[in-house]
Amino acid sequence: MAASARGLRTLQSAHSSTTVPRLQLAVSRCYATTTSPDPPITNSSNSSNSSNSTPTPKQRITAFKDKLNAGPSFSDFVSGGGGGGASNDRVPLDPAEAYALKTALVGPPGRKKQIIRLPSWLKTPIPDTPNYRRIKSDLRGLNLHTVCEEARCPNISDCWGGSSKSAATATIMLMGDTCTRGCRFCSVKTSRTPPPLDPHEPENTAEALSRWGLGYVVMTSVDRDDLADGGARHVVETVRKVKQKAPGILLECLTGDYAGDLEMVALVATSGLDVFAHNVETVEALTPFVRDRRATFQQSLRVLKAAKEARPELITKTSIMLGLGETETQLWETLRALRAVDVDVVTFGQYMRPTKRHMAVHEYVRPEVFDLWKERALEMGFLYCASGPLVRSSYKAGEAFIENVLKKRRGEGADGGDGGNSTRREDVERLVAGGVVR
């Protein structure tokens, strides 16, 4: 028994003195950007060679970044293009195919619904230019708001990102960014009790517009039914401040209806502005379904009429959205009603749904239909008509024309003119002949 125990201890001692080689394990990390098999288990003699052949995590990330940089840009993705050579050689679409509306199924499984995709003629580039960044910086520094951002205007890349300082512009929105009304087409914030008016806003607005050095600018405002005067005196003060800082500037104001108070309308019309704009938005039959219940079609007509009566030489302007379900007969009636109150300028644009909480688009109107209504409006005697899918009431499409009309009425740069005493129709004919309208 004792001999057996001694033999066992001898075997244990001999086994413990034997050195067992330790295996070196190479650790492998997995990244979502690459796929590679796990490396084999190697010993210390060849571990250095395997580390040289396997890419490091930093090398993998660098390779992935290189692939992204070599591919299409984000703007190519949004516009439907591509960065490869094959996509650049696509055959142009014919008009019938380009204007064809495409549908898509959206929603969770089992509850998908078909929607009409945004037509190609309504897609605009992503804004990113020096002028865009400069204007945005000025607005933030002066605590100003714009309808371009609040109403999600599709033309912001064009207006803010003009090719030069004089070409870039923004539409200032006065009296804050919160409206007391809730129209079903508008994405501006709404509240029954919006914040109080900023007493520095008139001065800050004048400072911003004087910095930009523009010849023609547009100011608009939210509706403020919580104020006794609807904010009319605030608008008047802003107009006067702007004219003091930049006497030569041409100023357009897109105003509300001031709850039908025509005295306030006359006060704004005689404040020194050059163009008085107030939008009827749609035909009379659709107004109760499109606009806030406090805004009526007939009240808007009275506002436009009162502005013209307060200053007969003042240019009056309004805007109509298409694609809400209006009929051709209703549009004819609307244009006749506007001419009856001597409205000078009318614009037509496509209604585009800002969010799912707003009323749906009834129809995407083709560009040639907008051209047709432009011809009809001019034949009815309107001074100017800007009509197109992306045209908005404060969009700069008509500003060059209106600016020239105003300058000729002032007698500035009129070639063989009559000191600005010509009729509106003669203004139109002379400017068209001079190549202002193309």
Curated annotation (Swiss-Prot):
E.C. code: 2.8.1.8
Cofactor binding, per record: Binds 2 [4Fe-4S] clusters per subunit. One cluster is coordinated with 3 cysteines and an exchangeable S-adenosyl-L-methionine.
Reactions catalysed according to its record: [[Fe-S] cluster scaffold protein carrying a second [4Fe-4S](2+) cluster] + N(6)-octanoyl-L-lysyl-[protein] + 2 oxidized [2Fe-2S]-[ferredoxin] + 2 S-adenosyl-L-methionine + 4 H(+) = [[Fe-S] cluster scaffold protein] + N(6)-[(R)-dihydrolipoyl]-L-lysyl-[protein] + 4 Fe(3+) + 2 hydrogen sulfide + 2 5'-deoxyadenosine + 2 L-methionine + 2 reduced [2Fe-2S]-[ferredoxin]
UniProt-listed InterPro entries: Aldolase_TIM, Elp3/MiaA/NifB-like_rSAM, LIAS_N, Lipoyl_synth, rSAM
Domain Radical SAM core positions: 162-383
SMART domains (alphabetical): Elp3 (SM00729)
Ranges of Low complexity composition bias in the record: 34-57
Pathway listed: Protein modification; protein lipoylation via endogenous pathway; protein N(6)-(lipoyl)lysine from octanoyl-[acyl-carrier-protein]: step 2/2
Transit peptide extent on chain: 1-31
Binding residues for [4Fe-4S] cluster 2: 179, 183, 186
Listed cofactors: [4Fe-4S] cluster
Region entry Disordered, spans: 34-58
Family: Belongs to the radical SAM superfamily. Lipoyl synthase family.
Name of protein: Lipoyl synthase, mitochondrial
